[in-house]
């Protein structure tokens, strides 16, 4: 994909050095969005290469596709469907092509890297219990190397329940985040989500409550997504 601006850059795109302006994180540049090999079988699939990975509601793993430069992943993704309604997913990722790319090193910093290298493992198990209930358990082990000492690496484990009953949609989710790999911090952060929705004559109404918590102490921080 390609991102090009028209006119002067009177904003901070995170690459142009215009730090006196507000951030619009859509830097100029061109990059290969996807390049992959894919195998499909009636019981699952496997994908190798640069690819989109969008899990669940994309709160933790997704493409951030509303930005001009979509986030994609370099690695392998395997999905297995051994039973009706059950999907088991595993991904190994060695590089994240972030929304701050392409990686031409213009004012590139650890805070907004074009590429995030590392060794990450994503595990996701989703089961459609009944038409009104889907249950998803997951663990995302992110070993990220863009900060010295592994300060952004984390392990997130959670459970999500969602569905619709009598036209009312709902979602309940809890996750816990701790340090992982070489992260020297002592993380213990919680995530909560509750949503209710209803559609009236094609208009969707939704109310939600979301908490990204953090524990006390100098070695902790807020829940990261």
Kindly give the residue locations of the regions a language model identified.
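Residues that define the transmembrane beta-barrel architecture of outer-membrane proteins
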Residues: 28-33, 70-74, 117-121, 153-157, ...
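Extracellular/periplasmic loop regions
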Residues: 9-25, 169, 173-225
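Residues on the lipid-exposed face of transmembrane beta-strands in outer-membrane beta-barrel proteins
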Residues: 34-39, 76-80, 123-127, 159-163, ...
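Transmembrane beta-strands of outer-membrane beta-barrel pores
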Residues: 1-5, 41-43, 50-55, 92-96, ...
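Outer-membrane beta-barrel translocator domains and adjoining extracellular loop/strand segments
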Residues: 7-13, 58-66, 99-112, 116, ...
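Surface-exposed loop and membrane-interface regions of Gram-negative outer-membrane beta-barrel proteins
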Residues: 1-35, 46, 53-68, 147, ...
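Repeated loop/turn-to-beta-strand initiation elements of outer-membrane beta-barrel proteins
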Residues: 43-47, 84-90, 131-137, 167-172, ...
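Surface-exposed extracellular loop regions of Gram-negative outer-membrane beta-barrel proteins
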Residues: 44-51, 152-191
């Amino acid at each position: 994909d390609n991102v090009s601006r028209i006119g002067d850059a009177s904003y901070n795109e995170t690459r142009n050095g215009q730090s006196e302006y507000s951030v619009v994180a859509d830097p100029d540049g061109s990059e290969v969005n996807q390049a992959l090999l894919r195998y499909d079988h009636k019981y699952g699939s496997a994908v190798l290469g640069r690819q989109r990975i969008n899990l669940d509601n994309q709160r933790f793993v997704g493409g951030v596709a509303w930005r001009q430069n979509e986030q994609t992943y370099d690695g392998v993704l395997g999905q297995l469907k051994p039973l009706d309604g059950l999907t088991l997913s595993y991904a190994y990722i060695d590089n994240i092509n972030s929304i701050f790319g392409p990686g031409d090193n213009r004012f590139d910093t650890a805070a907004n890297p074009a590429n995030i290298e590392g060794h990450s493992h994503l595990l996701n198990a989703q089961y459609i219990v009944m038409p009104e209930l889907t249950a998803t358990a997951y663990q995302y082990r992110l070993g990220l190397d863009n900060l010295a000492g592994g300060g952004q690496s984390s392990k997130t484990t959670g459970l999500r329940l969602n569905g619709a009953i009598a036209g009312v949609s709902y979602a309940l989710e809890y996750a816990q985040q701790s340090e992982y790999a070489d992260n020297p911090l002592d993380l213990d952060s919680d995530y909560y989500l509750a949503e209710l929705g209803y559609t009236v004559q094609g208009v969707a109404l939704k109310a939600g409550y979301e908490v990204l918590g953090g524990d006390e102490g100098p070695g902790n921080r807020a829940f990261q997504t």
